[in-house]
C-alpha cells in the first residue's frame, strides 16, 4: 500500500515484535524509507490522533471492522476504506458508514483505490464522513436519544452495495470444519494462551 500511495502509513494499535520485524523487512525489500511507517501502540483518542497526524484515509480494521473507531474516523472528517466481509455486512461495519464509502474485498482493490485517489477525492469523502457522523452519531443525536429515551430510535437504512461472497464463505467453512482447519485453530489458540501468559 505504501508503494501505491507515496505517503505514510500510521498503524494505531498493538503489533507484536515479529510483525514489526516483518514490516521493516518488507519496507527494506521494496526500498521504502522506514519513517514512512509509523507505529503507535496506543492512543486515548483515535479522532485526535487522526487529526494530529493529518491522516487523509482511514483503512478500517479487517476482516472484522471496528464500529467505534469507524465513528471516530468519520467524526474527524477522514475518508474511509472499508473491507467487505465475505459473508457478514455486520462484521464489516458496512451499514455504519456513509454512502459512497470506498469498499474493497481483496488487496488489489484497495491498492488501486489508494493509487487513484487524489487529494480532492479524499477531501470530499472526508466531508461526507463528517456529515454522516453529525447525522447519526453526533453529541446532539445522543442527547436527543437520551432525552426521549422512551421513543425508539429509527433504524438507519441498509446501504446498497453489499453482496456476500459465497465462494469465499464456502472456502472458509471448509477450512473450519476440516481436520487441518481444526488443528490450525487449536495451534493458534495455544499460541495466544502462551503469549497472554507471558504478558
What are these regions (language model features)?
Residues 23, 45-49, 70, 110:
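Acidic, amphipathic alpha-helical patches
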Residues 8-22, 38:
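Glycosyltransferase donor-sugar binding loop
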Residues 22-42:
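Nucleotide-activated donor-binding/catalytic signature segment of Leloir-type glycosyltransferases, i.e.
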Residues 35-51, 65-66:
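Conserved active-site histidine-acidic residue motif and adjacent donor-binding/catalytic loop
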Residues 1-7:
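Short hydrophobic signal-anchor/transmembrane segments that target glycosyltransferases
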Residues 53, 57, 61-137, 148, ...:
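Catalytic binding pocket for nucleotide-activated donors in carbohydrate/polymer assembly enzymes
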Residues 111-199:
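C-terminal amphipathic helix plus adjacent low-complexity
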Amino acid at each position: 500500500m505504501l508503494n501505491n500511495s507515496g505517503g505514510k502509513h500510521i498503524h494505531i494499535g498493538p503489533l507484536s515484535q515479529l510483525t514489526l520485524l516483518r514490516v521493516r523487512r518488507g519496507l527494506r525489500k521494496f526500498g521504502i524509507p522506514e519513517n514512512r511507517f509509523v507505529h503507535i501502540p496506543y492512543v486515548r483518542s483515535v479522532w485526535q490522533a487522526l487529526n494530529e497526524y493529518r491522516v487523509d484515509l482511514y483503512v478500517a480494521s479487517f476482516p472484522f471492522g471496528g464500529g467505534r473507531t469507524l465513528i471516530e474516523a468519520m467524526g474527524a472528517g477522514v475518508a474511509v476504506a472499508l473491507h467487505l466481509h465475505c459473508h457478514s455486512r455486520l462484521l464489516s461495519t458496512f451499514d455504519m458508514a456513509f454512502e459512497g464509502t470506498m469498499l474493497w474485498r481483496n488487496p488489489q482493490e484497495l491498492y488501486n483505490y489508494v493509487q487513484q485517489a487524489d487529494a480532492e477525492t479524499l477531501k470530499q469523502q472526508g466531508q461526507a464522513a463528517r456529515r454522516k457522523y453529525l447525522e447519526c452519531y453526533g453529541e446532539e443525536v445522543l442527547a436527543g436519544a437520551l432525552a426521549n429515551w422512551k421513543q425508539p430510535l429509527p433504524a438507519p437504512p441498509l446501504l446498497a452495495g453489499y453482496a456476500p461472497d459465497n465462494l469465499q464463505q464456502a472456502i472458509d467453512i471448509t477450512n473450519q470444519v476440516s481436520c487441518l482447519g481444526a488443528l490450525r485453530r487449536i495451534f493458534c489458540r495455544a499460541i495466544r494462551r502462551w503469549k497472554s501468559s507471558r504478558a
